[in-house]
């Protein structure tokens, strides 16, 4: 008899399965591939494969009760035999209970992750090109624009809470096929985004001197930063609108349109920056202010492309303005109830990061320049990773909204570990080409060595950090917006902030040690987040279909969750 995989032959006292033993396929859950194929394997070999391959859809109860006979005699003796049989049966049960094979899930993830990652990578690449162009003007310009980017990131923290709430509701309503819920959720999200954009536009345009004085004490950097920030503030409304539209399109799995818009935006940004920074084609050389004008034009182009393509492709929901802003007080209350932990998290973490950046911004000029370049490289990693995080949000939220909670959990942990693996690959890829990248961005001497040290530290901790990030996004998409948010806020202000300020202000520690302490909480949070993931308590649907099945799911796993009743 031919041995099976892992040295196990399919010899036993039980009969091999026949076609009558196959479990019927359920529409929407079981793939059709392999149903019509005639296998070349013998019946015994097929039975062995039941415990090994998720593509063989036999009754998992038969698989779990099957007792294999091992090729090697030592494995057939007790207690080794009992242990291996138990492990084999558990493995067979696990495989047969898995509704979606990893290959199928991977294809679904890639369909969302690759366009989103490409869009984000293009955007980050555009920022790198900006940095390279500004690097030809000097380290002062690079550092000043980098500090302005931190103010933009604070705006990102301010509106990302509403983005997270919008993705939660839209993805779950998408799984439920609730068109009215999708439109109203998008309208609520867009209204709050507009309010945040208005506040930051005012601060950037009317109070740029105050903003720059918060971030740095260097007068040279303040002068360049004020000029840049006063202009780039007008890009914020278009930037936020593009993000809102892209969020809706991603949540309904129409990811190619934002990708095309991102490509046009990057090309526009790079072209305009080259012309306006250096004064080409008869235009005056505007320096850092030219980069700000390029950002404005790029974001306008992004919005126009998304609107035109959505209209041409007859994309639902995006342009149905009347349906966006109807009466929906109950939904607004529920939206805010689910979103406020995310909003609180993003605002407080944004403030915490600003406090960290203030510490990092009051270092030597070489360290400030190194930090600006590092943030650009970090953006590459986050852009690459965020595509997979977006896939987790959409694919898990969709199944929770449809009431398929077992499938949601199965997708969640697979995608989370995939996110971590891709993050590690991305970090190693950037680290392998660090020399030409750092030299191209105008770093040399101390600033070069500092930036390299920062990225080496980040390579070690980045995989853990992105694991925490992807788990938090997954919990939010499933309706649990509080756990990860509370955990992150607590560790930021109870551990990270004291550690950084004590090291910097009291002990005057080296810059790289202070930087490393920015991530001191990540390993501890990872352990806590993993425990919460396997508890399954984070599945809290907002859709009617999801709520209809959550009771049986919780009863099955003995889960007790206190939730406020929807109004």
Please provide the spans of the model-predicted regions:
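Helix-terminus/linker motif at the lipid-water interface of multi-pass membrane proteins
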Residues: 121, 125-143, 212-219, 277-286, ...
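Transmembrane helical elements of multi-pass membrane transporters/channels
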Residues: 111-130, 231, 265, 298-302, ...
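Short runs within selected transmembrane alpha-helices of multi-pass transporters and secretion channels
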Residues: 163, 167, 232-251, 258-269, ...
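Short alpha-helical transmembrane segments in multi-pass integral membrane proteins
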Residues: 61, 66-116, 170-237, 283-340, ...
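Polybasic, lysine-rich low-complexity intrinsically disordered segments
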Residues: 37-42, 57, 62
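Small-residue-rich hydrophobic transmembrane alpha-helices
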Residues: 142-202, 239-253, 257-258, 357, ...
